């Protein structure tokens, strides 16, 4: 029995010490979920955290976008460039075209779904009854142009 207790204590101590390892910051940098710096846009019902690059400037960018639960949706809009999206958590609801009807014209995309928003194509998106966290990769600047009825889309 004493030997068994010793083995259990040794295993617990070994497991605890595994978390004390320090990584070389020249090789690996990480941010724990509780330390992600979200910028909340209450009016839009979402929050964003920049992971890499600067989405307001030309070049590659990576952002996390969190659509907040409560039936928050963007209005129909388009972006100048393609965007590549992975649903990390929750269910993200996506619609295409100028007819804004989140209740009847959106597709639920669960965590693990991969989506491409093609540049200069009208879509809208958001969350219904749960938060949806997305990882978005694109080529900046990441502007969003609202679609207005009768508007002619720019050519690709």
Regions found by a protein language model. Give the residues of each.
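Bacterial N-terminal signal peptides
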Residues: 5-16
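A short, N-terminal "cap"/entry segment at the start of jelly-roll beta-barrel domains
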Residues: 19-61, 149-156
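Double-stranded beta-helix
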Residues: 27-29, 122-156
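Short acidic-glycine-tyrosine-enriched beta hairpin
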Residues: 43, 56, 98-120
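Glycine- and acidic-residue-biased ligand/ion/polar-headgroup-sensing regions
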Residues: 68-71, 78-100
């Amino acid at each position: 029995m004493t030997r068994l207790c010793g083995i259990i204590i040794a295993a617990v101590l070994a497991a605890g010490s595994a978390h004390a390892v320090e990584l070389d910051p020249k090789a690996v940098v990480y941010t724990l979920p509780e330390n992600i710096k979200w910028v909340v846009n209450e009016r839009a019902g979402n929050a964003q955290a920049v992971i890499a690059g600067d989405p307001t400037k030309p070049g590659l960018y990576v952002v996390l976008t969190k659509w907040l639960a409560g039936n928050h949706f963007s209005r129909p809009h388009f972006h100048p460039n393609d965007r590549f999206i992975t649903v990390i958590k929750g269910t993200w609801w996506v619609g295409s075209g100028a007819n804004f009807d989140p209740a009847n014209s959106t597709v639920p995309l669960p965590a693990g779904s991969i989506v491409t928003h093609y540049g200069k194509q009208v879509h809208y998106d958001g969350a219904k009854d749960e938060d949806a966290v997305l990882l978005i990769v694109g080529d900046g600047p990441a502007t969003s142009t609202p679609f207005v009825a009768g508007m002619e889309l720019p050519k690709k």
